[in-house]
Amino acid sequence: MRIMFMGTAAAEGYPALFCVCDRCKKARELGGRNFRSRSQALIDGRILIDFNHDALYHSKLCDIDYTYIKSLLITHRHEDHFSPYELNYRNRGAANLDEGVEKLQIYGPSDIKPPLERFIRDDNNYGFDVNTVEPFEPFDVEGYTVTVLKAVHGGGALIPYIYLIEKDGKALLYAHDTGILPDETFDYLK
């Protein structure tokens, strides 16, 4: 299993936009790899994790063509992980795709569905489908077993997830942007 981290920073990026602390000043001075964009990753060139405002930058920086990516896991609906507006650009009128390109299958917590529903159109033959997933219920994504696990982040109104991704005897726990995990998540992982 190969993971490409395209972005590893928090919402403010690094160095932070308006920060003048010594670390951010030094990062600006050094440049290059000291700059970090918002969280996004790609598993084996097939499964994308999170889609934020830096997605266009990531596609250029990492030479990734999102057109043929069929699966997207969303960890939570904060904008540094999830941008429904960017996903709208996959719809007719904004994108001209090759015939036969499959709809993007988006998997995530139930609270990502309402902001995406406004972009789902009946005449859309290559946009996306939204699949809500529940904790501790493994499901298949392109031959990978994906298990949603509960995370702690952002207060009570947010539904944050982390993902356990397994294939061919290998496992990846993708656990970004979370506090101390709930006991039931630790119990599941034992």
Predicted segments with their positions:
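Core dinuclear metal-dependent hydrolase active-site scaffold
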Residues: 1-64, 132-185
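Alpha-helix N-cap/helix-start capping motif
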Residues: 53, 110-111
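A short helix-to-beta-strand connector/capping loop
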Residues: 102-103, 123-129, 142
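Extended hydrophobic secondary-structure segments that form protein cores and membrane-embedded regions
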Residues: 105-109, 132-133
